[in-house]
Structures are given as C-alpha cells and as structure tokens.
C-alpha cells in the first residue's frame, strides 16, 4: 500500500510506518493546498494528513486512488467528510492522541498569563533583570480562582481536572449538550455570558469550524471582568 504522510513525525513513528507500507513522508511545515491534496489522493492508496492540509470539497475529484484519510489529530475540520464519503474515501482521526498534551498547554498558558512568565523571560533575555524586587512583575494567584471551560469534551475535561485537583479552582463550564457523570465537581451554565462574567480564567476548548467561528467577539470580551483572562 502506498502511503503519504504530509508532515514529519517522530523517528519511531516514521520507522514503524516505513516498515509496514510504501511510505512517502513530506519534509515540509506548511499544509497541502487543495490541488496538492487532490494530487496526493490520485497517487496514493492512503494519506495521513493533519491540520492545515486543505482536503476541501474541490480536492475530491473523479478517479482518485485513495481510499483512506487517516487524520493525525482529533480535529478534522480541514477535511470535507461529506465529499470524502461521496468519493468512497473513509476518514479516521485520533481522538485521544493529544488530549493530555493539549490540556497541559492550556495550563501552561494560564500560568504564564497569571504569573507574567513571558514578560519575565523577555526581560531576562534583554539583560534587564537586576535582581528580585517586591513589586517586580506582580501577577495574580491561580489557586482558588474560578475557571470557565467552554466545551466540556475530552480536552475540556482534562483541563478542568488539572484546574480542580492541581490548583483547587472552582470549575464552571458551558457545553452545547448536558454533561453529567464528571469525576470532579463542576457546574454547567447555560450561556457564555454567565460563564464569562463569573470566570477569572476562561478557556476555549471547542472544535474549529464554521459552527464555532467568531464564538468569542467584542460582546464576549466585554463580559469578562477587568482582571480576567481568556
């Protein structure tokens, strides 16, 4: 089977794929254009794409050889799944591959913002740090604050667990459907306005796509308190 992998992977993953398939691994950092996606599906039995590769409706043309798009990542909004199905091409994804890593990054961003870590690093790299001062780069506490999770899916739950168990934070969340049987205390709120007005930190953990585009705009930002972060 001929397989195209659209980005570099870890050495172990590349070795495993090459040992099993006739594998071509693209050495690039930008995504495939629609024309390149169409050409890949015409030449290969399977393609392993990821975010940024444009498998939009126009890429699914007559006479394609490809029968599988094995997406690397949970999100697949860069693939027109309806067009793929019409062309007889199966689409798979990896729902839990990056759940924990994404939640770690969310907590990293919360801590960096609250404790002004980015500012401190830039100060140090500029050679301007002259020693500790009582009021230097004062941030705010994270422990005991309220976090609002927008989207309580796998990633949202992983973020909420870290916030509650790691920092004793109160957890609010907004989700399009009712979420129950959580293994940590949390309160679901009906609207974004209610969540944002009560949150010290708000985290967006929803899939990308037309349904969530512009979810956060001027109105939502104005609901945040003067010392809140999103």
Which ranges hold each PLM region?
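Rossmann-fold dehydrogenase core element
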Residues: 85-97, 225-229
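Residues at secondary-structure transition points
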Residues: 32-35, 50, 71, 93-104, ...
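An N-terminal-biased, well-structured beta-alpha scaffold segment characteristic
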Residues: 1-92, 197, 217
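Short glycine-centered segments of the SAM/dcSAM-binding site in methyltransferase folds
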Residues: 68, 201, 229
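Rossmann-like dinucleotide/phosphate-binding beta-alpha-beta segment
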Residues: 135-226
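Phosphate-binding beta-alpha-beta segment of Rossmann-like dinucleotide-binding domains, i.e.
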Residues: 87, 95-146, 158-166
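Short, flexible loop segments at the rims of nucleotide/cofactor-binding pockets, characterized by
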Residues: 23-30, 46-49, 126, 178-185, ...
């Amino acid at each position: 089977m001929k397989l195209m992998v659209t980005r570099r992977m870890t050495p172990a993953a590349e070795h495993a794929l090459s040992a099993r398939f006739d594998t071509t691994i693209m050495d690039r950092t930008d995504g495939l254009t629609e024309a390149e996606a169409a050409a890949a599906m015409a030449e290969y039995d399977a393609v392993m794409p990821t975010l940024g590769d444009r498998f939009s409706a126009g890429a699914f043309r007559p006479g394609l050889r490809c029968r599988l798009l094995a997406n690397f990542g949970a999100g697949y909004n860069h693939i027109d799944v309806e067009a793929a199905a019409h062309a007889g091409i199966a689409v798979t994804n990896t729902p839990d591959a990056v759940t924990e890593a994404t939640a770690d990054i969310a907590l990293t961003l919360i801590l960096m913002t609250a404790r002004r870590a980015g500012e401190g690093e830039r100060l140090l790299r500029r050679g301007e740090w002259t020693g500790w001062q009582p009021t230097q780069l004062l941030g705010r506490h994270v422990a005991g604050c309220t976090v609002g999770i927008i989207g309580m899916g796998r990633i949202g739950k992983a973020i909420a667990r870290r916030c509650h168990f790691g920092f004793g934070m109160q957890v609010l969340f907004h989700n399009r459907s009712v979420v129950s049987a959580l293994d940590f205390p949390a309160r679901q709120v009906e609207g974004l306005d209610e969540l944002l007005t009560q949150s010290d930190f708000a985290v967006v953990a929803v899939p990308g796509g037309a349904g969530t585009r512009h979810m956060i705009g001027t109105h939502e930002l104005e609901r945040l308190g003067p010392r809140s972060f999103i």
